[in-house]
């Protein structure tokens, strides 16, 4: 297996590619951060469900959500990367697709959506946009 320099970008790319190909499920390696991001994406209604499988080498299987023939996810974009970190203050948290999408932020209070971060009045690192 190849060494992945940005596992979060790899996860988002796998989800994006699976939605383009109309796959029902997609799998990738487990990490706690990925699970937290998937919990946020699931609460926002972009995926049906996800499961952690395996004992020693854990994998995550995500069940994608479709409305008819269209995916619930129109787009995914990794913002802050290992080579270029992107931070924002609470007052400058961006609206994704004029409020129709979500931004996932890593804050001092954990991983939050853009709306949760505004309510908590905390800024942080912008992980990804999903719309």
From Swiss-Prot:
One of its GO biological process terms is:
translation
Q: Name one GO cellular component term.
A: ribonucleoprotein complex
Q: Which InterPro entries match?
A: Ribosomal_uS8, Ribosomal_uS8_CS, Ribosomal_uS8_sf
Instruction: Determine if Transcription is one of this entry's keywords.
Output: no
Gene Ontology MF, one: structural constituent of ribosome
Q: Which domain of life is it from?
A: Bacteria
Keyword RNA-binding attributed: yes
A Pfam family that the UniProt record links to this protein: Ribosomal_S8
The record's keywords, sorted A to Z, are: Ribonucleoprotein, Ribosomal protein, RNA-binding, rRNA-binding
Subunit description: Part of the 30S ribosomal subunit. Contacts proteins S5 and S12.
Q: What protein family does this chain belong to?
A: Belongs to the universal ribosomal protein uS8 family.
Q: What does this protein do?
A: One of the primary rRNA binding proteins, it binds directly to 16S rRNA central domain where it helps coordinate assembly of the platform of the 30S subunit.
Q: State the protein's name.
A: Small ribosomal subunit protein uS8
Q: Supply the source organism's classification.
A: Bacteria, Bacillati, Mycoplasmatota, Mycoplasmoidales, Metamycoplasmataceae
């Amino acid at each position: 297996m190849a060494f992945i320099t940005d596992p979060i970008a790899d996860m988002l790319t796998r989800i994006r590619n699976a939605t383009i190909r109309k796959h029902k499920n997609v799998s990738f390696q487990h990490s706690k951060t990925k699970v937290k991001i998937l919990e946020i994406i699931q609460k926002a209604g972009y995926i049906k469900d996800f499961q952690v499988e395996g004992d020693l080498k854990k994998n995550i299987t995500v069940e994608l959500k479709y409305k008819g023939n269209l995916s619930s996810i129109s787009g995914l974009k990794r913002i802050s990367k290992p080579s270029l970190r992107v931070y924002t203050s609470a007052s400058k948290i961006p609206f994704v697709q004029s409020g129709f999408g979500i931004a996932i932020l890593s804050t001092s209070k954990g991983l939050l959506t853009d709306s949760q971060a505004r309510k908590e009045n905390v800024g942080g690192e912008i992980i990804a946009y999903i719309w």
